[in-house]
């Protein structure tokens, strides 16, 4: 049932949700207008890697991030976060651990020229491996796969081009997804949603884009009628 509905929504439906319903994408679009492209993409990756154990909703955190960095001159991403996180409203836990992550990934981020960003956007699986190696963590770690998703958003905004996510990158095991998975199955989230991805033809990161805003209570009123009907059907299952 859920694979059928997600298949009917499809990648183009997921794209509509990402660009018009997901507050994270809206926050990034806002920030992109107030900072240079390279710094924008670097910040988005860095922010993704510290987006855990939040003290508010993910939507609130990404808007706080976007408003904080809009128009700001960022010389060092590590130093910027050393100032930002302790004063953050929605991300105040485990600050030393999060700053350590930023420090570990900063050398990799410094390699992201506009040309390199475009190359990685054409091969997001390669980016996935590069971020995991820079951090020294498992590729399937929640924040690593999430950082690829958010890089995809940022690169799409900067390059004005849509590239679908690779099928092999798993869904981020965020609390909303974990809770929903328990409601639907006894399988592990990553395994279950990879199976749904293969059945529906919609890559796991796009499935995440469909589910995550809806689980957060996002309105579907802006969707075209046909897509809105499918989303309403999906909401009955997941909420």
Curated annotation (Swiss-Prot):
Keywords: DNA damage, DNA excision, DNA repair, Hydrolase, Lyase. 8-oxoguanine binds at residues 24, 51, 62, 146, 172, 208, 212. InterPro entries: AGOG, AGOG-like, DNA_glycosylase. The keyword Phosphoprotein does not apply. The active site is at residues 142, 174. GO terms for molecular function: class I DNA-(apurinic or apyrimidinic site) endonuclease activity; oxidized base lesion DNA N-glycosylase activity. Residues 118-182 are annotated as: Helix-hairpin-helix. Pfam families: AGOG. GO terms for biological process: base-excision repair. The keyword Nucleus does not apply. Its EC number is 3.2.2.-, 4.2.99.18. It catalyses: 2'-deoxyribonucleotide-(2'-deoxyribose 5'-phosphate)-2'-deoxyribonucleotide-DNA = a 3'-end 2'-deoxyribonucleotide-(2,3-dehydro-2,3-deoxyribose 5'-phosphate)-DNA + a 5'-end 5'-phospho-2'-deoxyribonucleoside-DNA + H(+). DNA repair enzyme that is part of the base excision repair (BER) pathway; protects from oxidative damage by removing the major product of DNA oxidation, 8-oxoguanine (GO), from single- and double-stranded DNA substrates. Contains two alpha-helical subdomains, with the 8-oxoguanine binding site located in a cleft at their interface. Contains a helix-hairpin-helix (HhH) structural motif and a Gly/Pro-rich sequence followed by a conserved Asp (HhH-GPD motif). Belongs to the archaeal N-glycosylase/DNA lyase (AGOG) family. NCBIfam families: PRK13280.1-2. This is N-glycosylase/DNA lyase. It comes from Pyrococcus abyssi (strain GE5 / Orsay).
């Amino acid at each position: 049932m859920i694979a059928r509905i997600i298949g009917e929504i499809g990648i183009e439906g997921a794209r509509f949700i990402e660009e018009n319903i997901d507050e994270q994408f809206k926050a990034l679009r806002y920030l992109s207008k107030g900072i240079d492209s390279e710094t924008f993409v670097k910040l988005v990756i860095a922010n993704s890697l510290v987006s855990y154990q939040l003290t508010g909703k993910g939507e609130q955190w990404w808007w706080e991030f976007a408003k904080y960095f809009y128009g700001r001159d960022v010389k060092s991403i590590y130093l910027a976060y050393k100032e930002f996180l302790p004063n953050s409203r929605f991300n105040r836990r485990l600050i030393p651990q999060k700053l350590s992550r930023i420090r570990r990934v900063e050398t990799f981020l410094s390699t992201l020229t506009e040309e390199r960003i475009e190359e990685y956007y054409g091969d997001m699986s390669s980016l996935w491996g590069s971020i995991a190696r820079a951090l020294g963590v498992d590729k399937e770690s929640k924040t690593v796969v999430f950082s690829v998703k958010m890089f995809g958003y940022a690169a799409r905004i900067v390059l004005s081009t849509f590239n679908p996510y690779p099928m092999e990158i798993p869904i981020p095991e965020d609390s909303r997804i974990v809770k929903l998975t328990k409601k639907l199955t006894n399988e592990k989230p990553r395994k279950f949603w990879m199976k749904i991805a293969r059945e529906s033809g919609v890559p796991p990161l796009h499935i995440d884009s469909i589910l995550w805003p809806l689980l957060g209570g996002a309105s579907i009123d802006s969707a075209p009628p046909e897509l809105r009907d499918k989303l309403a059907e999906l909401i009955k299952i997941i909420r």
